[in-house]
Amino acid sequence: MSFASAPTVPTNTSHYADLPAASSALFQAKARRGLTFDQIAKAIGKDEVWLAAAFYGQARFTEDELITVGEVLGIGSSELVSQLGSHWWPNRGLGPMPPTDPVIYRLYESVLVYGHAIKAVIHEKFGDGIMSMIDCKINVERKEDPKGDRVLLTFDGKFLPYARW
């Protein structure tokens, strides 16, 4: 496994201050086991981006998923369930605005630069409405390119027309 792809624990944890302690335990166990989000996600039948969002407290595990994740990571699932079980709800929207992390800032910048253009094209193709982030799948792929590998992001969101009344 190359250094660039080795699972790690993020070094700056200030933006995790409002997350349950279980989130930190999940990241540490993932790094200790040397597993990727994709490997863990497959164990519970989820996508790697969804699983990463759940680690960051932005998506909600079921109790069965918490038990399986605990088994895969070798950590006590009873502690995970007690912190992230059916009584817990995500507080979505993590981090400062504007973002300070370079990767997250570039995603933010892409919406600042291309947001209105994307919106206009969505309206031309679908009509007056929005793309759901609730009913959405996100995929991250690596695309080889002679000028340097590229990041291919796919947002597969359900179109929701605005209601008329």
Curated annotation (Swiss-Prot):
UniProt-listed PANTHER family: CYANATE HYDRATASE
GO BP annotation list: cyanate metabolic process
Gene that encodes the chain: CYN1
Purpose of the protein: Catalyzes the reaction of cyanate with bicarbonate to produce ammonia and carbon dioxide.
UniProt-listed Gene3D superfamilies: Cyanate lyase, C-terminal domain (3.30.1160.10), lambda repressor-like DNA-binding domains (1.10.260.40)
Annotated SUPFAM superfamilies: Cyanase C-terminal domain, lambda repressor-like DNA-binding domains
Protein's name in the database: Cyanate hydratase
Keyword Lyase: yes
Organism encoding this protein: Laccaria bicolor (strain S238N-H82 / ATCC MYA-4686)
Pfam families, alphabetized: Cyanate_lyase (PF02560), CYNS_N (PF21291)
Active-site residues, as the UniProt record annotates them: 106, 109, 132
Reactions catalysed: cyanate + hydrogencarbonate + 3 H(+) = NH4(+) + 2 CO2
Enzyme Commission (EC) number: 4.2.1.104
EC category name: lyase
Family to which the UniProt record says this protein belongs: Belongs to the cyanase family.
Keywords, sorted A to Z: Lyase
